UniProtKB/Swiss-Prot annotation:
Family: Belongs to the exportin family.
Keyword Transport on entry: yes
Protein name: Exportin-6
Alphabetized UniProt keyword annotations: Cytoplasm, Nucleus, Protein transport, Transport
A single cellular component GO annotation: nucleus
Name of the encoding gene: xpo6
Domain Importin N-terminal: 31-97
Species in which this protein is naturally found: Danio rerio
Length: 1128
């Protein structure tokens, strides 16, 4: 005994030293090795049990429990049966005797070890494990401890974190399911007992959802005073229920009384904070109570639960409800159960949105503000689950008043205290509107009756959403939203808020077009009048102009009006899609009114150029004015598809005046803004409008308009006042498309191709003049680089924009570009050492190959490829690839992309290049990337290999799939076998690498090759590679290195095994198991026997899961056996 006490003191000293801030890492390693050595000795668990029982040092207790945890989870098979029995007896006794004294995290760790033993031994060797837990739950003084054990049992036995055999996992789940009725009954009893004990008045059932006043009366039945011990107990019970509900199926065990109990506690979250006099504690103090987390802490009798702790009970109760709501698979006989849940929730929603509370001092918003934030989030989650998962089940039930529910949801939504809460509720409305739209499309016959049922609610929703985006009504709240920092979607907080709001407006528009238009247009008109009236306040003074609005109140009003006009213009643009297609004629007048107004506003902005006017508070008003002008152009651009349809209609009519006026005025609005001195936001909006007119609308007369001619002159003649690059590219694209794209509704003979071709050639000649005149050899001056990069950027964009167009457009484009392409090819070798320039050149050539390779012709294409192949030597490739993320690496990627395009060309055109491309791929690129981390280049190289195999299968296999099947096993005609084998080896090697993206990509490539070309059935693959691939994929599953791809890997395994199931089960499987280290013959036989020779995918997948899981389990068991153990 004395030696054990001495050991304990020494251990405590060591543990204290280990965690001391002054202890060096080297010393910590020494201590760790010393402890691990001692813990690993056979029978050392007795010492650790003594340490655990007799020490109050938390470090010692935690380490002791870690030793036991490791013993149970990793070495249990090798522990002697009498030692196991002693541990099963000692540890629970220790827990019962000391649980009240232990810190809660130590107590929980001890509970976890006991549950781990139960997971291994219950019921065969530890038959009273679960019954002991249930007895604790039923004991008034030990119920909390029992609930901690019960929750851990649910967590650890249903979803075991350590390896168990599949049979054991199934057994445990079945054993627990058998106990669920008893468990739920006990938990119901706990909740009911506490509720009944603390209820102030007699509780009545939930009201009918249609009763508006009963919800108020029921508020009195919620216990406002709850002692801390009861609160902690209920919190643990609800935590247990939440976890149980996450995995048990819906069944009759979830009784109405259990549901009612949960909803009783959900009411706690609805309570307002109140001032109550705390009950005196045993020592005479008064203190607010708190519920211990995770069942921790100890509650003194008489301590009461405060508002925050009551809210935690409400949150946990909502957690339970949401776990039930998540279950999409609802048996038919559970419709009544669901209805009961929704009636209870309806009641809670009434309480949350009730303005007649007993204090009569709270607005709904302030009530929600006072509630626990987590409770409101959980309640919103519930509403989302109800609408998205169960609305279709409950809508037609006469006992559930959906319209009244929507009225309450409306109040709940528009009284949210936070922007995030409001947006979460808007998401619920979006789901509801999608549901309604789908329902109407499937029931067109009674469309009107469905819409009329919800019409008033939707119009109300529309008005309120529009109100919420207006600064004149909500300036202080909207100013809180950040409009500068971009999120992962490249949106600011304000932009996200506005976008989500406008999506709701658009969904209402789809259902109620005329009502939406009549609500939106007057609001827009009001702000437009303010904007259009600004001209009268402009005062001229010599050459300068000033906006004569200076009073602070007037500036604030103007700021709000301009922000709102900007938002409403975006709303008008978002609705453009609802005026085209089949409804074009029916809604023509409304759309025409909108477009005319947008043209008027755009012209007005361009004529008086308010961005150029001096004003008070320019830092606020100038961005507002620029934004309104930009948004008017963007909204007009959104109607380009409507204008295109209008263009098609007027082609068939004599009178085109209206259409011509709209286009002429639009261009008059855009043209003055295409100037380097204009603010960039405005400039880009004008450029995008020009592109849409040229690309989408395509009026015949567009190019002849004076405003457009001015733009041509600016771009082709005025090289000294160049636009910013992005704007320059957009304008060049628009001008090019005006000349290249066919005019709609006109026959080929009236397209004026010769004239347009000549004009396009002149345009390109002007754009590329400096580029074509670059000196050779180049002077490598930075201006030369700038000319190359800027010119090729423009040309690449022009080619890309017509890549999907008709042959004539592409022919004209290539004819104009021909000289520039020749220049680019001549310059390429001269800049091979400058990756920034080479990257731009290869980007240009890649776009050319993708869009114009037919027009370029075979000979010239082959010349380009041969030039590239000769330039990219092994050394050049190595330099580029090894600088990961650099321009050099990008150059290699672009080169491989170009080769991908080439090898995908059908026919025999580029087949002579295949040997060179394969050699580059396998002999030059692959050796460099095989052992290095260069994922981008590696991904492109495997994509190229795949395309070579996929698009040029007969380069390797002369026979077709059909003839090879008909030959039924005869000799296959194969060529280039060495390259094919090398390619397959490269794919196989990639499955041994940690890169999960390459693994997924390459696995899908093999699957495509098998689907299209029967890769796995080919004789060479079947005989020499198939089992190697299966072995590698199984080993990957065993090592859990790519668990995210488990389903993909299993599907590939199935397709490979399906080549010859008989050989897989009779030959491969025994061979695979014989090669697996760490198994005995009996285990190998068991594994093979349990993998039943099924041939359907679900059964095969289950077999793969089982063999992988059980193999890992056996290895774990065998690794834990003491040396020299006789394995039977």
């Amino acid at each position: 005994m004395a030696s054990e006490e001495a050991s304990l003191r020494a251990l405590e000293s060591l543990m204290t030293e280990f965690f001391h801030s002054c202890t060096t890492n080297d010393r910590k390693r020494e201590i760790e090795e010393l402890l691990n050595s001692f813990a690993g000795q056979p029978g050392s668990w007795r010492h650790w049990l003594y340490f655990l029982s007799n020490s109050r040092n938390e470090y010692v207790m935690m380490y002791s429990l870690t030793v036991f945890e490791n013993l149970v989870n990793k070495m249990w098979v090798g522990v002697a049966s009498e030692d196991k029995a002693e541990l099963r007896s000692c540890l629970p006794k220790l827990l019962l005797s000391q649980h009240a004294l232990l810190p809660f995290f130590i107590r929980n760790k001890l509970c976890k070890v006991i549950v781990d033993i139960g997971r291994q031994d219950w019921p065969m060797f530890y038959h009273d494990f679960f019954s002991n837990t249930l007895q604790l739950v039923q004991s008034p003084s030990l119920a909390s401890l029992g609930l901690v054990l019960l929750k851990m049992t649910s967590e650890e036995l249903v979803c075991p974190r350590e390896d168990l055999s599949v049979a054991r996992k199934d057994e445990l789940k079945k054993l627990l399911l058998d106990q669920i009725p008893t468990v739920l009954n006990l938990l119901t009893r706990i909740l009911e007992t506490v509720w009944d004990k603390h209820s102030v008045t007699v509780t009545t059932p939930p009201p009918s959802p249609t009763s508006r006043e009963s919800g108020v009366m029921l508020g009195d039945s919620t216990p406002m005073v709850l002692d801390a011990e009861s609160g902690a107990l209920c919190l643990l019970a609800l935590e247990c229920l939440a976890h149980l509900f996450s995995w048990i199926p819906l069944s009759s065990s979830i009784t109405p009384s259990l549901l009612a109990s949960i909803f009783h506690f959900a009411r706690f979250g609805c309570q307002q904070p109140i001032k109550t006099k705390p009950l005196p504690t045993s020592n005479g103090d008064s203190a607010p109570g708190s519920l211990p987390a995770n069942g921790g802490g100890h509650c003194r009798t008489g301590q009461i639960v405060g508002h925050a702790e009551r809210a935690r009970l409400g949150v946990m109760a909502m957690n339970c409800i949401n776990e039930l709501m998540c279950k999409n698979c609802v048996p038919v006989d559970f419709e009544e159960f669901l209805l009961r849940m929704f009636q209870q929730t309806f009641y809670l929603l009434q309480r949350l949105t009730n303005t007649h509370s007993h204090t009569n001092t709270h607005t709904i918003k302030s009530r929600l503000q006072d509630l626990d934030e987590s409770y409101v989030e959980k309640f919103t989650d519930f509403l989302r689950l109800f609408v998205s998962v169960h609305l279709r089940r409950i809508e037609s039930n006469a006992q559930f008043p959906l319209v009244e529910f929507l009225a309450l949801l409306f109040k709940y939504t528009f009284n949210q205290p936070s922007h995030e809460g409001y947006l979460a509720c808007l998401d619920i409305w979006s789901v509801f509107l999608d549901y309604l739209t789908t329902k109407i499309r499937s029931r067109l016959a009674d469309r009107d009756s469905v819409i009329n049922r919800y019409k008033d609610a939707l119009v109300l929703l529309l008005r309120e959403v529009l109100n919420r985006i207006q600064f004149r009504l909500n300036q202080s709240q909207l100013e809180e939203l950040d409009d500068e920092t971009l999120d992962d979607d490249q949106q600011t907080e304000w932009q996200r808020y506005l976008r989500q709001s406008l999506e709701v407006v658009a969904r209402v528009m789809e259902l109620l077009p005329s009502q939406t238009f009549s609500v939106l247009f007057p609001v827009l008109q009001e702000d437009l009048d303010v904007y259009l009236g600004l001209q009268q306040f402009i005062v001229r003074s010599g050459t300068s102009r000033r906006l004569n609005i200076t009073a602070e109140a007037d500036c604030r009003k103007l700021h709000c009006a301009l922000r709102d006009l900007s938002s409403l213009l975006q709303a008008v643009g978002r609705l453009a899609e609802f005026f085209t297609g089949d409804v074009f004629t029916a809604r023509f007048n409304d759309a025409l009114a909108i477009v005319q107004r947008l043209v008027e506003v755009s012209c007005y902005g361009s004529q008086i150029s308010l961005y150029d006017v001096e004003m008070a508070v320019p830092s606020v008003l100038k961005p507002d004015l620029i934004d309104v002008h930009a948004q008017s152009l963007a909204a007009l651009q959104a109607y380009s598809h409507w204008l295109a349809q209008f263009c098609g209609e007027v082609q068939r009519q004599q009178d085109q005046t209206q259409f011509v006026d709209l286009i002429t005025s639009s261009m008059a609005a855009a043209s003055p803004l295409i100037n380097g001195k204009v603010p960039e936001k405005l400039l880009l909006s004008a450029c995008h409008l020009l592109v849409s007119m040229a690309t989408t609308v395509r009026p015949v007369f567009l190019v002849s308009l004076p405003a457009v001619q001015n733009i041509f002159n600016l771009i082709t003649e005025n090289h000294n006042h160049r636009l910013p690059q992005e704007a320059h590219v957009l304008v060049c694209r628009a001008l090019s498309n005006m000349l290249l794209l066919p005019w709609p509704s006109l026959p080929e003979g009236e397209q004026q191709w010769p004239n347009r071709s000549a004009n396009h050639a002149r345009l390109i000649s002007s754009l590329t003049q400096q580029y074509r005149l670059l000196p050779r050899p180049p002077n490598h001056h930075h201006t030369s680089k700038a000319v190359i990069q800027q010119t090729l950027c423009v040309l690449r964009d022009l080619v890309d924009s017509i890549s999907g167009e008709a042959t004539k457009s592409r022919q004209i484009c290539y004819h104009s570009l021909q000289e520039s392409v020749q220049v680019s090819l001549a310059l390429f070798p001269l800049f091979i050492q400058q990756p920034e320039v080479t990257d731009e050149m290869l980007s240009f050539f890649l776009t050319l190959f993708q869009a114009l390779r037919v027009q370029m012709g075979v000979a010239f294409t082959e010349q380009i490829i041969q030039t590239f192949l000769s330039m990219f030597t092994r050394e050049q490739l190595a330099v580029g690839i090894l600088q990961e993320g650099s321009s050099g690496s990008k150059v290699v990627q672009k080169f491989l992309k170009i080769l991908q395009v080439v090898v995908q060309e059908p026919g025999q055109t580029f087949k002579p290049l295949l040997p060179s491309i394969l050699s580059l791929c396998l002999d030059q690129v692959y050796p460099i990337v095989a052992e290095r981390s260069c994922p981008d280049v590696r991904a492109e190289m495997f994509e190229l290999l795949f395309q070579i195999l996929h698009q040029n299968w007969r380069f390797f296999f002369k026979s077709s799939v059909l003839s090879s099947v008909q030959r039924s096993g005869a000799e296959e005609l194969m060529e280039n076998q060495a390259q094919f084998t090398a390619a397959m080896q490269a794919f196989g090697q990639s499955f041994l690498q940690p890169d999960i993206h390459i693994f997924k990509q390459n696995l899908s490539y093999l699957e495509v090759l098998n689907t299209k070309h029967k890769l796995y059935h080919r004789k060479l693959f079947r005989n020499a590679m198939l089992f190697h691939f299966i072995n590698v994929l199984l080993q990957v599953l065993l090592h859990k290195s790519h668990d995210l791809l488990q389903e993909d890997i299993t599907l590939a395994l199935y397709n490979m095994a399906a080549v010859d199931f008989s050989a897989f089960y009779s030959s491969f499987l025994p061979e695979f198991l014989n090669g697996c280290q760490g198994l005995d013959p009996h285990q190998r036989t068991t594994l093979a026997r349990n993998f039943t020779p099924e041939r359907d995918l679900p059964s095969f997948s289950q077999g793969v899961y089982r063999i992988v899981n059980d193999l890992r389990f056996y290895r774990l068991c065998n690794g834990s056996l003491p040396p020299g153990t006789l394995k039977l």
